[in-house]
């Protein structure tokens, strides 16, 4: 079967399942937290993370797509398995194509955003900030003359806070001085974020793709391990 035939088969199957998507979940009496895409259930000694077919953009749910949850969940599980030599992760098991059973962790209130290119269109994107004239961003100094979509000389970590209403860009010095993280934890997590991104770039390149930017979240498990 060639690629075009394979794509056609997938399209046909998706068309049949357009009205059969996973948009809502219910897991008995377990305490539930609902995100834009994932539902989280507290199982006592672990968490059940259910990836639905909900499609979100710009902080809102727009639609649902057949099999999206399975693809996203299994892709995540694959990446976690591929990167466990860099840093441990929260996965206990993949209980279902849509479900991961995970360790409970206390998440650091910082999102580790790593960028390989100067691009984007949102108010917090690196290109928007740069195009507005800023040359200092999240503790990084940017040179003059950069063009949109240009590859950065080196990967850049641009952390943001995890706050209830609005995440804000923040520098490493501010992270420590404002007590978001200790210096030791920041040094370790920032190093691992850059290692993860470099590994992701390598894997993407091997498959004819580029990893432009991504976000990592980290935390401590009940044994104190990051």
Regions found by a protein language model. Give the residues of each.
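Polar/charged alpha-helical tracts
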Residues: 5-8, 12, 183-187
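Secondary-structure junction/capping motif
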Residues: 6, 34-35, 171, 210
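Active-site loop/lid in soluble adenylation, ligation, and acyl-transfer enzymes
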Residues: 7-160
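Conserved metal-phosphate-binding beta-hairpin within the catalytic cores
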Residues: 114, 211-226
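A short mid-domain helix/strand-loop element embedded in enzyme catalytic domains
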Residues: 152-182
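A long amphipathic alpha-helix within ATP-dependent nucleotide-binding catalytic cores
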Residues: 181-212
């Amino acid at each position: 079967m060639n690629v075009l035939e394979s794509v056609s088969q997938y399209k046909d199957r998706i068309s049949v399942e357009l009205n059969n998507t996973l948009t809502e979940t219910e897991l008995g009496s377990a305490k539930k937290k609902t995100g834009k895409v994932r539902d989280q259930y507290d199982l006592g000694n672990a968490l059940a993370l259910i990836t639905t077919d909900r499609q979100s953009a710009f902080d809102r749910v727009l639609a649902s797509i057949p099999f999206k949850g399975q693809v996203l969940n299994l892709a995540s599980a694959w990446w976690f398995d591929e990167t466990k030599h860099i840093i441990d992760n929260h996965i206990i098991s993949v209980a279902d194509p849509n479900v991961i059973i995970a360790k409970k962790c206390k998440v650091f209130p910082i999102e580790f955003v790593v960028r390989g290119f100067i691009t984007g269109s949102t108010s917090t994107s690196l290109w928007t900030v740069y195009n507005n004239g800023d040359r200092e961003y999240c503790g990084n100094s940017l040179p003059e003359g950069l063009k949109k979509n240009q590859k950065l000389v080196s990967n850049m970590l641009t952390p943001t806070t995890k706050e209830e209403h609005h995440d804000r860009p923040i520098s490493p010095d501010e992270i420590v001085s404002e007590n978001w993280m200790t210096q030791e934890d920041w040094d370790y997590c920032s190093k691992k974020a850059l290692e993860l991104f470099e590994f992701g770039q390598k894997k993407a390149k091997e498959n004819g793709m580029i990893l432009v930017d991504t976000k990592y979240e980290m935390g401590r498990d009940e044994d104190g391990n990051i």
